[in-house]
Amino acid sequence: MGGAIARGLSTCDLFRPQDITVINRRASKTAEIQGFNPELQAVTGDYSSLATADIVIIAVKPWMVEALIKEHLTGKRPDGQIVISVAAGISLEQLQTWAGKDRALYCAIPNTAIEVKQSMTFITGLNATEDQNRLVLNIFGALGKAELVEERLLGPATLLLRYRLRLPLYPGSDGGRGRAGPLPAKGSRRRSANPARGDRPARIQRLAPRTGGG
């Protein structure tokens, strides 16, 4: 996921590729990033850039997040540094316990279509200002669609993305309520209309239960 995000960001207008540093644990992954765009700052095992980064996106396995933060993100850093985790199952409370209360923290749930700027990304934040919220939304919005939600809704949002379930597209399939689970009905069409973001409307329409006895 980290590589997909870096590749997507390198092709949008928010950042210059040379201002994006991608840290890998394996040299083979570093070579892949360099092959995609030599201007990206791809390194292997060098975390020194985290001390000066304005935005840090953590895209590692969930069980690695705590150690990474404690080892590389608890020292000197710029004021207003934003930390974004895209690791599944990591809560804002955990991030705050490991990283501290004095920085903006976010959990984001993108999908791999982010590489081609067609992701639907759900985001929740803590200790953040409105300006920081707008910045993070702009970043992920440049990579598809982005929506700021309450943390309790990240689970349902993940299920929607994982199973490609878009019942709000078909009024009546849920008894006429116009929603699937606890996600707000408002914006459901915007979240679900693009096949490149994993949607399969025709298949879902066939699977949706019929109403009205037809």
Task: Locate each region found by the language model.
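Internal alpha-helical scaffold of NAD(P)-dependent oxidoreductase catalytic cores
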Residues: 94-104, 120-156, 167-206
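Extracellular beta-solenoid/beta-roll
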Residues: 201, 210-214
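Rossmann-like NAD(P)(H) cofactor-binding subdomain of soluble oxidoreductases
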Residues: 27, 36-37, 45-123
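Small-residue helix-packing motif on alpha-helices
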Residues: 20, 30, 49-50, 185-191
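NAD(P)+-binding Rossmann beta1-loop-alpha1 motif at the extreme N-terminus of oxidoreductases
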Residues: 1-45, 118-119, 176-182
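Short acidic-hydrophobic, aromatic-tinged amphipathic segments that line or gate anion-handling sites
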Residues: 41-48, 147-149
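Short acidic capping loops at alpha-helix termini that bridge into adjacent secondary structure
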Residues: 16-19, 79-81, 187
